C-alpha cells in the first residue's frame, strides 16, 4: 500500500469531528432536535483551528470564497461544510459555529456548536503530529461548554433536555488511517489498527453518553484512495483511485457500523446511526455527470495540478487534495439527513 506520499500531502489539510443537537425545534414532525454538536476532523470543523499553532488551518483565501461574503472562516472547503448542512437539514441553524471562536455568542450555545478540529483523529499521535485538538480533548471542551450553558440557561432541567435531545455528529478516522497508520505499519496490521480505532470510538461514545448524550450520528471515513492527494502520488500513472487504501477505509467502516449496531443493546436509551460517507462520494466519483460534475481526480484548489484555483468549484467533486467541495456535500446531504431523522426518532 502506497500510503507515504498521501500521508505527507494530507499533513497540512486533513480532517476529523463529532456531532450535533437542536433546540426545541421539530424535524419530520415527530422529533425535537434541540441542538447539534460536532466532534472530529475537518469534515466538520468550522474554525476551531484558527488560533492554534498548526499548519492544519485554512482561514485564508481561496478557502471560503463561496461562503457567505466570500469569507475564509477556517472551514476546510470553498463554502459551507458538512456540519453546517446537517445543522440546517435538522432545522437547528444554518451555520454551526466553532466553539473556540473568540467571537462566539452566548446566544449560540443552546442550539449547539462545533468542537471538531481539522487534522485530528482518534489516535493521540494523529492530533499531536498536527498540533490540533485531539478528539478526547474535544470532549473536555464539551464538558466546559455544559458549564457555560448552565450559566446561560440557568435551569438544570432545560440544560438536561438540550443535551439529551441533541444530535452528536462525529467524524473521526480519516486522518488516523491516512496520516498516522502509514508510520505504524511495522507495529500494527490493518486488522489490529482498525480494531483500535473502533475501540477508541466506543470509548468516545460512552464518554458522551455519560454526560447525557443520547442521539449519535457517526460518520464512516471517505474513500481515502480516491482523494486527489492519493491519486496524485508518485508513480500513480492515470491518477486512478488507490484500491488498497480504499480497502483499508472499507474495513474500518464495516467494523464501525457493526460496533454501532451493538451499542444499541448496551447503552439504554441511546440511538445510533452509521453515516455512510464512503459510498455516496464514491458514487459521485464513478458517475460524476449525473450530478453535474466534470472533474473527479483533481482538487479545484491548492494542488500542484491547480496552483491557480479553478473558476468554478461546483464542477469538482473535491475542493482540494483532501476535502469534498461544497456542492459534493450538498449533493449527498439530503439522503443522509433523512436517514438521521428516521433512525434517531
UniProtKB/Swiss-Prot annotation:
UniProt GO MF annotations: lipase activity
Give the sugar-modified residues. Answer: 103
- InterPro entries linked: GDSL, GDSL_lipolytic_enzyme, Lipase_GDSL_AS, SGNH_hydro_sf, SGNH_plant_lipase-like
* A GO CC annotation given for this chain: extracellular region
Which residues catalyse the reaction? 42 (nucleophile), 320, 323
Does the entry feature the keyword Isomerase, yes or no? Answer: no
Report the enzyme's class at the first EC level.
Answer: hydrolase
First and last residue of the signal peptide: 1-24
The record's subcellular location field reads:
Secreted
Q: Which SUPFAM superfamilies match?
A: SGNH hydrolase
| GO biological process assignments | lipid catabolic process
Looking at the UniProt entry, the stretches that span the membrane are none
Q: Name one Pfam family in it.
A: Lipase_GDSL
Is the keyword Hydrolase assigned to this protein? Answer: yes
UniProt keywords, alphabetically: Glycoprotein, Hydrolase, Lipid degradation, Lipid metabolism, Secreted, Signal
* The enzyme's E.C. designation: 3.1.1.-
Family the UniProt entry places it in: Belongs to the 'GDSL' lipolytic enzyme family.
What name has this protein been given in UniProt?
GDSL esterase/lipase At1g23500
Amino acid at each position: 500500500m502506497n500510503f507515504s506520499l498521501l500521508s505527507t500531502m494530507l499533513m497540512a489539510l486533513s480532517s476529523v469531528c463529532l456531532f450535533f443537537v437542536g433546540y426545541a425545534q421539530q424535524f419530520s414532525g415527530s422529533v425535537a432536535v434541540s441542538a447539534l454538536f460536532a466532534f472530529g476532523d475537518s469534515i466538520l470543523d468550522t474554525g476551531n483551528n484558527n488560533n492554534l499553532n498548526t499548519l492544519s488551518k485554512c482561514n485564508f483565501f481561496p478557502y471560503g470564497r463561496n461562503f457567505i461574503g466570500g469569507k475564509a472562516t477556517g472551514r476546510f472547503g470553498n463554502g459551507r461544510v458538512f456540519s453546517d448542512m446537517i445543522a440546517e437539514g435538522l432545522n437547528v441553524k444554518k451555520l454551526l459555529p466553532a466553539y473556540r471562536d473568540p467571537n462566539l455568542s452566548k446566544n449560540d450555545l443552546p442550539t449547539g456548536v462545533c468542537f471538531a478540529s481539522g487534522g485530528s483523529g482518534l489516535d493521540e499521535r494523529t492530533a499531536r503530529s498536527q498540533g490540533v485538538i485531539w478528539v478526547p480533548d474535544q470532549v473536555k471542551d464539551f464538558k466546559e461548554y455544559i458549564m457555560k450553558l448552565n450559566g446561560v440557561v440557568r435551569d438544570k432541567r432545560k440544560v438536561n433536555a438540550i443535551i439529551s435531545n441533541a444530535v452528536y455528529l462525529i467524524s473521526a478516522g480519516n486522518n488516523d488511517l491516512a496520516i498516522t497508520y502509514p508510520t505504524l505499519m511495522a507495529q500494527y496490521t490493518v486488522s489490529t489498527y482498525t480494531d483500535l480505532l473502533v475501540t477508541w470510538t466506543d470509548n468516545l461514545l460512552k464518554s458522551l453518553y455519560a454526560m447525557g448524550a443520547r442521539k449519535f450520528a457517526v460518520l464512516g471515513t471517505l474513500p481515502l484512495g480516491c482523494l486527489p492527494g492519493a491519486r496524485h502520488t508518485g508513480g500513480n500513472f492515470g491518477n486512478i483511485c488507490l484500491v488498497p487504501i480504499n480497502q483499508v477505509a472499507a474495513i474500518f467502516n464495516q467494523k464501525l457500523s457493526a460496533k454501532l449496531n451493538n451499542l444499541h443493546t448496551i447503552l439504554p436509551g441511546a440511538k445510533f446511526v452509521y453515516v455512510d460517507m464512503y459510498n455516496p462520494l464514491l458514487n459521485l466519483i464513478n458517475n460524476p455527470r449525473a450530478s453535474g460534475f466534470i472533474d473527479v481526480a483533481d482538487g479545484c484548489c491548492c494542488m500542484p495540478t491547480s496552483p491557480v484555483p479553478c473558476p468554478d468549484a461546483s464542477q469538482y467533486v473535491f475542493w482540494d487534495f483532501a476535502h469534498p467541495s461544497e456542492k459534493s456535500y450538498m449533493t449527498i446531504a439530503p439522503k443522509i439527513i433523512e436517514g438521521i431523522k428516521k433512525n434517531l426518532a
